[in-house]
Amino acid sequence: NNRIEINKINSDMISLEKQISDVAEGLKDVVTKSELADMMNSFVSDDDEKWLMFNAKFSSADEVYETIYKQAKSSIYVVDNYIGLRTLVHLKNSPTGVAIILFSDNVGNNKLHNIEFTDFCKEYPTVNLSMKKTGGIFHDRFIVLDYGTADERVFLCGASSKDAGARITSIVEDYGVSKYAPVIATLLKNPTLILPQ
């Protein structure tokens, strides 16, 4: 009986060691107080650089969006009701041949206008970009790469890409991609977004 109990305790200790090892590994990506203080100070500095938190790391906002978009293999879907020229500029280096759909109702001040969109398309003719309405039901913003494929990825975005880094915000990858399928399927049926002149 003692031998069985000793074996069970031994097994429990091995399991506990594994859990502690996993926690220690996860702590490598945790932001320290000093890193967070540096980030907060950058939001109130006169520096032009825009910063955000990306998967618990302090990063340049523009670089984060461009890095995410460059990973796409077949499609990029951006859901963001507050769009502007900066939203488009983040997409300029997307891989050639990737279909990009921007889902938006284009609300708020500083809306994207047709002239800006037309000029962008002329300057970056290899960017395959179209727009659809969101239908007034979205608050959150997110990016979906390679929808409906084995490579599908979803990123939740705290702020609109046109304002990213202006205030404290973050982008995180959500690994539960299947829950977004009905949302994206609905969005794909929405009408084309017509931009104001």
Could you tell me what each predicted segment is?
Residues N1-D62, I83-Q197:
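PLD/PLD-like phosphodiesterase catalytic module centered on the HKD motif
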Residues I68-K73:
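Secondary-structure "cap/kink" motif recognition
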Residues I76:
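Catalytic histidine site
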